[in-house]
Amino acid sequence: MAKLGPGQGLGCEAAVGLLAPSRKREYKACNKLTEGKRPLYAIGFNFLDFHYYEVFATVGGNRVTTYSCLKDGNFAILQAYIDEDKDESFYTLSWACDLDGTPLLVAAGSNGIIRVINCATEKLLKTFVGHGDSINEIRTQALKPSLIISASKDESVRLWNVHTGICILIFAGAGGHRNEVLSVDFHPSDIYRIASCGMDNTVKIWSMKEFWPYVEQSFTWTDLPSKFPTKYVQFPVLVAVVHSNYVDCTRWLGDFILSKSVDNEIVLWEPKTKEQSPGEGSIDILQKYPVPECDIWFIKFSCDFHFNQLAIGNREGKVFVWEVQSSPPVLTARLTNPQCKSAIRQTAVSFDGSTILACSEDGSIWRWDEVDHPKA
């Protein structure tokens, strides 16, 4: 299958953002909390239910913790889950919900085992086994929040139904990734489409359209999950080489894709696929968002619910906030704290962008709140 490089599009020059903060939005450092000495690899707000917009979770070591962001700038610990295996190291989390709306928290990491926690009963609900190696990222389908997708070191991506415990699809094989899959994301409106990226330096776009009957079947399956006719999706609809090194984070922005590697920038690009000719198409590089000292892998960015603000940390403990949809890109703020010197592994931006959280290599959570943010 042909791999598409940046030259195979319109050839227009990409708009590059300037690193001078516009001060359109000002944030103040207002809190720090240290969970322990083990690195925190993931942090995320719950955008699935407006009752829980102030709730976020972190993972690090064999612990999953949920918090509430209080209006006075403090944190309140809500729940903590300690995995039975003390050697587990969680790398990723995602919020999901059961068919009745019960909030679920899904976490996975070095053991390659997915844990589904019921936040209402505060108990482990389900455990999914299937991946042959560690899991680097889990994402939830916002249009059907009982569907999750996992990206693994075993070079595969898997689609799961958290309600029935079924592994529905495995994206791997002849056209699959050739090294660890580091990040994955569902398209925000095209329910059939996902994007994945990894250590083979590629971003792959996949379609579930012809396999969708199996997705529907997974909701009504009454036999053992192990007896479900799990299907392989072997060929993506597009393979793009936008970066020359590991690609460790990718997110859809409408029909465009944001992705980053270890070369101090995030790239916004447009994939143009041909439905009738899988594997063929073109890509156009649209914009670049510089991020200084962001040259190590497993640093992930995040956005607010409406994809207005994007926040990303670097290896020196600084956070850069970009106005995603401006052209050229506008740097909203550069967030620092004299005590924050460890690598920021992931950020979390609140629903309206008024609070930005970051989790770091030294086990700390950092919080910045917007100054004079208009309250609803």
From Swiss-Prot:
Keywords assigned by UniProt, alphabetized: Chromatin regulator, Developmental protein, Differentiation, Repeat, Transcription, Transcription regulation, WD repeat
Tissue expr: Widely expressed.
UniProt xrefs under SUPFAM superfamilies: WD40 repeat-like
Pfam family name, one: WD40
WD repeats: 85-127, 130-170, 176-216, 242-279, 291-332, 339-376
Keyword RNA-binding: no
Residues in the signal sequence: none
GO terms under cellular component: chromatin silencing complex; ESC/E(Z) complex; PcG protein complex
InterPro entries: G-protein_beta_WD-40_rep (IPR020472), PcG_WD-repeat (IPR051243), WD40/YVTN_repeat-like_dom_sf (IPR015943), WD40_repeat_CS (IPR019775), WD40_repeat_dom_sf (IPR036322), WD40_rpt (IPR001680)
GO biological process, one term: negative regulation of transcription by RNA polymerase II
Homology family: Belongs to the WD repeat ESC family.
Subunit text: Interacts with EZ1. Component of the polycomb repressive complex 2 (PRC2), composed of the core PRC2 components EMF2B, EZ1 and CLF. PRC2 methylates 'Lys-27' residues of histone H3 (H3K27me3), leading to transcriptional repression of the affected target gene.
Record's miscellaneous remark: Plants silencing FIE2 have small and partially filled seeds, and exhibit seed germination before seed maturation. Plant silencing FIE2 exhibit aberrant pleiotropic phenotypes in vegetative and reproductive organ generation, and derepression of some developmental regulators, such as MADS3 and OSH5 genes.
Free-text function comment from the UniProt entry: Polycomb group (PcG) protein. PcG proteins act by forming multiprotein complexes, which are required to maintain the transcriptionally repressive state of homeotic genes throughout development. PcG proteins are not required to initiate repression, but to maintain it during later stages of development. They act via the methylation of histones, rendering chromatin heritably changed in its expressibility. Involved in the regulation of seed endosperm development, grain filling and seed dormancy.
Name of this chain's protein: Polycomb group protein FIE1
